[in-house]
Amino acid sequence: MTSVVLLEQLKAFTEKIMDDMILPVAMQQGDTEQAYRAPEVYLMRLPDSRSAKKKAPYIIHRVIPLETEQQPGSEERTVVSVRSIFCCYNPDEQEGDLALLNMMERFRVELLKVRKVGGTGTDGKHRYQFALDLSPGHKLESVPYDGETKPYYAGEMITYWKLPTVQQTEDIKLWR
């Protein structure tokens, strides 16, 4: 459940920082003029994977491996990886690559500015629940996909997030 809340908070953050980035939408059969809009944000996958080209521009945030560990003498920590997939459309190849780079860079820069996402508490104050983890081995990576996909351009970014610690509520009794 906690990773679902992270995805929801990441979606809200992404929608806020991308709301003024207006990109071309692929023209569909029957369209008479080019439409433009901000990238839509989805969680885990597109609602209909067969419509990947029709949905561009978009960003998908997807949780990948979750790990919980506890080193001797230190607090338990849970880290989740999030793969963010970016996709845009542009009939001009140079503009398409630049639009993709712009989407990915805006997300990366805004994320590095705050390094946390969260929600609003019952008192109306902003609460940060999730911290970006840039510890050794958890670097922020971004890769534009190479390949002949024009006029669609895609790339991905991997981020790591520290989740709140789950508190043990029951004592463990071992059989003897």
Label each PLM-derived region with a short phrase.
Residues L101-Q168, R176:
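Acidic-leaning, charged glycine-interspersed low-complexity segments
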